[in-house]
Amino acid sequence: MDGEEHQIDGDEVNNHENKLNEKKKSWGKLYRPDSFIIEAGQTPTNTGRRSLMSWRTTMSLAFQSLGVVYGDIGTSPLYVYASTFTDGINDKDDVVGVLSLIIYTITLVALLKYVFIVLQANDNGEGGTFALYSLICRYAKMGLIPNQEPEDVELSNYTLELPTTQLRRAHMIKEKLENSKFAKIILFLVTIMGTSMVIGDGILTPSISVLSAVSGIKSLGQNTVVGVSVAILIVLFAFQRFGTDKVGFSFAPIILVWFTFLIGIGLFNLFKHDITVLKALNPLYIIYYFRRTGRQGWISLGGVFLCITGTEAMFADLGHFSVRAVQISFSCVAYPALVTIYCGQAAYLTKHTYNVSNTFYDSIPDPLYWPTFVVAVAASIIASQAMISGAFSVISQSLRMGCFPRVKVVHTSAKYEGQVYIPEINYLLMLACIAVTLAFRTTEKIGHAYGIAVVTVMVITTLMVTLIMLVIWKTNIVWIAIFLVVFGSIEMLYLSSVMYKFTSGGYLPLTITVVLMAMMAIWQYVHVLKYRYELREKISRENAIQMATSPDVNRVPGIGLFYTELVNGITPLFSHYISNLSSVHSVFVLISIKTLPVNRVTSSERFFFRYVGPKDSGMFRCVVRYGYKEDIEEPDEFERHFVYYLKEFIHHEHFMSGGGGEVDETDKEEEPNAETTVVPSSNYVPSSGRIGSAHSSSSDKIRSGRVVQVQSVEDQTELVEKAREKGMVYLMGETEITAEKESSLFKKFIVNHAYNFLKKNCREGDKALAIPRSKLLKVGMTYEL
């Protein structure tokens, strides 16, 4: 390179690609490379935290999952038959027909669909509606904010498959999705609908589970049952702050005992009353049931469906555990226990058709009644944990994707990533659960609402997994059709039945969903408008350099981090800042925090630098990339990493330019075309103290408020180190968002009132970014959107 900085343009890269691999003709279409795609730092392979998980850890997580995931589906036997036969049992054969429905619903939906298919659609070990959404966004540009960069696909956690001739169908669908704004909006709305329904489950599950268990004490009046239930709910939500791992280890033994009781009680009733109910294993009895009951049988499906409530928690809570752990615990413990207890209850009902309203407790052998009752109450409390944990997970994911107002997310386990607790949401859920319990008072009414929420999430999951099969897995079209037709038909049949009870309580989850969707949609809508405004009003690089190097602008010692959401271009806030303060730090960095559709980013891939102006200007751009499951580091740790990788970037650029001791004058007037991801030669990152070595010659680099021309890489890194010793200042825009005067009344209401109300009542941006208040300087500006 002879001491010259090597400039890379798009044509050179395209020619280089063609020479490297003529066969991969679809590469350009899939990745749309620009001039950064070849020179972007190649990252080490990351096989993911789940792949190397030991057998002991897997079994430990499987045990924990009993206490978090299966409480909901495990306590369904408390109320399924009572919710199905609301008008009593007219024919003993109806019991066999319903049992057959229950067995095949659990087998097909819970075991086959979720345990063996849906769990495979995880995002590097994370589950839930937003995990599916992020997975789709990673393979197709379906995000509503246009901040994707080609270098993002170089992250090890993207794990994209290289183009092959087998990708034609997937590529065609991907192209259509990327070019359709309507498809992007629909996918987003479906995603936040599923997320809202999961949060709604977190409200309804505790209410119905606790009420159903406490009602087992026949001597208690309804008012007392409701009062005791409310007290239990308060204790449950107060316990959440201790974290999922502690909750899991505390609750898992109880659920294990509960499942043991279910198996024992089920076998007891089978052998004592009527073992012939096992003929329900023949699916023909489902057909016979509908022939006899007709419309009433269809209505009863709303009660049958309750046997799989909580199934979605297996996927939503996946980030707390692992795929293998959930598969083991469900297949070996939960599934056999559930099938056994439902068979035993059916055997009891064939002899005691009049006891359907309290089937579970009446079928318990007398010596086991009180021990079972105590465990049932404990299990019902634990049942609530599944959807509470799921609600925390999906809110955390949606927050990192910019689709939820800022709230505090606490990671409760240093050992298991993905275990989170959100204080504000926890107490809001508690208040909502108490309100539902006091308003509905019985499990029958809550059950009507509960079914709608659960089955809607399942339908959404089926549709999104079908899309993943088409675009990502590239599954044979026959298997895709079978998956969609079989599970889609089952779930739509159940949905039609539960919607029949809309006026009897079914309106509640839809009301909750509408409110949450409106909140998330408003937040995302204004967030996109704000981003597009900054993109439209951004200032050019030349103007920014001219402003910063103007004789009227002083360069003060230190590092200034100017936060902007733009990953390309310079925010108009920069011009506003310069015109008002007339000073720029000796090392000035335009920094963007970007959340990618992966669950985590390794530290060596996190910082993405480039020069804004000439190399002696001390001006840089930095994109700091996080996964949607990560929190921003503490300030001291962030500053150490930032300075370390900034100096690595300077060394890298020096090496790429040929290692010359001086920078050619012509290069100082041009912005290099290539952004560079810093990949240090080792994984070492200093944990404390100074980073790098400082030379005495740097003492004169900053004089009289001006920057002296830097000639060597040592001088540049020394300047950065000296600036760090002077301290970092965090500069943030304090923008006031208003709608344009000519905007419609609806837009004015959304922007001026709804969004600003949410903004005032959520966490401030500097708190979300973990910025120390003592180092914060805010720049006020009004945006008219």
Swiss-Prot record:
Question: Which superkingdom is the protein from?
Answer: Eukaryota
Stretch list, region Disordered? 660-699
Q: Does the keyword Transmembrane helix apply?
A: yes
**Residues with Phosphoserine modification:** 35
**Where does the protein end up?**
Cell membrane
Tissues expressed in: Predominantly expressed in the roots.
Mind listing the GO molecular function terms for this protein?
A: potassium ion transmembrane transporter activity; potassium:sodium symporter activity
PTM note says: Phosphorylated at the N-terminus (amino acids 1-95) by CIPK23.
Transmembrane segments in this chain: where? 61-81, 98-118, 185-205, 219-239, 248-268, 298-318, 328-348, 368-388, 420-440, 452-472, 477-497, 502-522
Q: What induces it, per record?
A: Induced in both roots and shoots by potassium starvation. Down-regulated by salt stress in roots.
Q: Which residues lie on this side of the membrane: Extracellular?
A: 82-97, 206-218, 269-297, 349-367, 441-451, 498-501
Tell me what effect the entry lists for residue 776 to H.
Answer: In hak5-1; increases transport
Query: What keywords sit in the KW lines?
Result: Cell membrane, Glycoprotein, Ion transport, Membrane, Phosphoprotein, Potassium, Potassium transport, Transmembrane, Transmembrane helix, Transport
- Acidic residues bias locations: 662-673
InterPro entries (UniProt xref): K+_transporter, K_trans_C, K_trans_N
Q: Where is the composition biased (Low complexity)?
A: 687-697
Where the protein is mainly located, per its record?
Answer: membrane
| GO cellular component entries | plasma membrane
* Record GO biological process: potassium ion import across plasma membrane; potassium ion transport
Q: Where is the composition biased (Polar residues)?
A: 674-686
> Which NCBIfam families does its entry note?
kup
Family (UniProt)? Belongs to the HAK/KUP transporter (TC 2.A.72.3) family.
Instruction: Note the subunit structure.
Output: Interacts with ILK1.
Sum up the protein's function in the record's words. High-affinity potassium transporter. Can also transport rubidium and cesium. Is essential with AKT1 for high-affinity potassium uptake in roots during seedling establishment and postgermination growth under low potassium conditions. Mediates potassium uptake by plant roots in response to low potassium conditions, by a calcium-, CBL-, and CIPK-dependent pathway. Positively regulated by the calcium sensors calcineurin B-like genes CBL1, CBL8, CBL9 and CBL10, and by phosphorylation by CIPK23.
Q: Sorted alphabetically, which PANTHER family does this protein's record hold?
A: OSMOTIC STRESS POTASSIUM TRANSPORTER, POTASSIUM TRANSPORTER 5
The protein here is known as Potassium transporter 5
Q: Which organism is it from?
A: Arabidopsis thaliana
